[in-house]
Amino acid sequence: SENVRASLLAYKMDTPVGPWRGPYSNVHAFSSQCFIHELATAAGRDHLDFLLEMFGNPRWLKPDDIRSLNTERAVGVIKRAAKEGNWGKPMGVREGQGLAFYFCHAAHVAELAEVSVDSANRVTLRKVTVVADVGPIINMSGAVSQIQGAVIDGYSAMVSQKITMENGVIAETNLDSYPVLRIDAAPEVDVFFIESDYAPTGLGEPALPPLAPAVANAIFSATGRRIRKMPLSELGYSV
């Protein structure tokens, strides 16, 4: 079949909850972008070529809504990320690159991650190249900081952040049990913008969703092991 139907269910909880940075986009990006990489691998295709081919001809997915996904803008950030991150360069043993794209909050963002994984499953995220098309940039230093922060935030969540419930109460009460990434594990983050003439979009959240699938795809390239759930600490990985 060429058609897929997806649905969401709103579930009422008795425990107070709040929004996560990027909300549902984080879950969708991780599952969809990792699966696209699996499809490319199964087809024996280069992930970059496979991803670009999916977008087809330049167009707005919703022609009457200029804040919808634009395939030309998507292709633009993906190609730029591949170029700036040197996609396909020779990598050493247990080293790999991973690519991911996601569209949310009217922003198009692509990320390329470089990792190494030692024999004890210690992951080193060496570098993340981020390219975003969010329209005109008014405050460049602020924009760069937003993306750098999103990468660190996203990697923190991917590595070790988990919420557990015990008798209706959240067990993690402070940063000792819900840790944020330390500076010695923080990657180099290269940020680039395609400054189009389209209306400015949000920037506080869009760079977070592509991070986890980019890193997961890089780990597979380095080790041959798929990452299908998070956090990595639950799978025997450390940083």
Model-found features: residue ranges?
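Cofactor-binding beta-sheet edge motifs in enzyme active sites
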Residues: S1-V239
